[in-house]
């Protein structure tokens, strides 16, 4: 799932690097149909398990990717879902998959310049996307989310986090720099939400669960290498294998973390 500030330059960076058409399809191979975020459908079901919505509910998915989250929410609850992603190529793919469903909308836009009415959404949801935003723009986004939520609304997020920066080694620093991520601790993330006036802030370090998901995905990749190579190159396989090996290593040594955050407007 993707979003990032500075629409023109960073949109180009993402579409030409991590989220090329082929890159998106490679991610979907390992995450599962309609997903390019950790755990695919299984994690989505778990994370949404205590959320109550209905057919009249309105949901915003920030960094909606291929749309798996919106599709699941619409299927489970019948809710209206609006996905925003900065990458036009990904949004085009997502829209092709929901053609004819007028309760699911995918839009290519920069969430930091997009505006919605106040008190508009019952749920604002984001999966592994806000890592692309600078600290300043994380704050800006959460202020907008607070405004957009209905008084009874809920904010629900998973995102990449990290240990304190003084503990980062050169390898991890290079990874974060190359991806243009801004990673903070789980505790710092929760503090930002509190500072943006959210109430009942719940933060959890789900890194152990994330590591389990990574192990399953890594195993799936190797068990299905022959099928993968019918679709993609050996170079892509090596790159994906290396990426998952690194994330598994960094999660086990508590360098990279996976945060869960839930908060309410009132």
UniProtKB/Swiss-Prot annotation:
Disulfide bonds: none annotated. Transmembrane segments: none annotated. It is found in: Golgi apparatus membrane; Cytoplasm. Changing residue 61 to E/N: Reduces activity. Inhibited by phosphocholine. Inhibited by hexadecylphosphocholine (miltefosine). Inhibited by S-adenosyl-l-homocysteine. Weakly inhibited in vitro by amodiaquine, chloroquine and primaquine. Inhibited by NSC-158011. This is Phosphoethanolamine N-methyltransferase. Changing residue 27 to A/F: Reduces activity.
